[in-house]
């Protein structure tokens, strides 16, 4: 008889009935302390070579039901190699149809990035000899919140801050961080060397380790959406934002990137600070220059489709990119990657995945280097 389980790092699903491989009935499980639901990650055993129909019956009540349209679930036999499987969304039900070729197979909303991978990422970064790892404090459940500092930390250095995975179900964000770190810590990469001659990087590859381990889609263990906590974070409800924001005020910020995943739109795009009260022509020109450079660095990035522009002065300053952009008067972006495929460069077998996220992380360093000379206002003007 088929068995469904999810008692592992980031696992998340509720089982209604798994006795019939042709009618496995499941339900999305909400975040541990909030009503958000979208992420799923579970294991199926005992159905090798059997045509399986897996129905997630409450998909229509998820946080982003439009995210299921033209979506294909991911699957893996070894949790290292993930591929897309036939999936359809009808009448509020997400149906996965797949014939497993082994007795154990995993299904997930997107290719996961585990806590073990996170710890290995920190270890590899430290082993490069270029990276200082600092403890910013502990999460609500006692997990470490680490900051990676790369550069000479000279007073004159540009201060570049990059955070990822405020929303824990957006695992592509940490894949992106891995790619960025891999290139930045490459002693032989000329772009990385040029950047570290003029800038110090402050990188938080996982802002929400509790939520990631719990299998949450959007919130931390206390039920807080971290990307709505930046104006008034607290050590109790949002210790992650509280600690990172405090460190930012110590270092200053010249460029800020907040890395995310987007459920509905099948594109890579950026959202800027046009709605901030202090937004001006200099920042508008910087945004344009950065997007142009990123398009040149990676054909996966585009600027035709994205979120609607925010009206002048109407930005929500509780959102990270808006708060940081307004507070420090700097170039500040949210970068979004799709849970679906990138419709401009589709891949039927793998869709948008961890490796493509990683490659985008590598590419963004070229865009950062291109705008470095423009990041600070001309003090002599």
What do these predicted ranges mean?
Residues 1-101, 105:
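Extreme N-terminal flexible tails
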Residues 11, 87, 137, 357-363:
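Glycine-centered structural positions embedded in regular secondary structure
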Residues 130-150, 155-317, 322-325, 332-337, ...:
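Active-site/substrate-binding loop(s) of hydrolase catalytic cores
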Residues 344-381:
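His/Asp/Glu-rich mid-to-C-terminal helical/loop segments that flank catalytic regions of hydrolases
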Residues 64-65, 108, 115-118, 170-172, ...:
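Short helix/loop capping segments that flank catalytic or ligand/cofactor-binding pockets
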Residues 40-44, 122, 290, 294, ...:
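Short, Φ-rich (hydrophobic/aromatic) sequence segments
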Residues 58, 111, 164:
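A short beta-strand motif that forms part of the nucleic acid-binding face
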Residues 88-137:
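Extended acidic/polar, glycine-enriched regions
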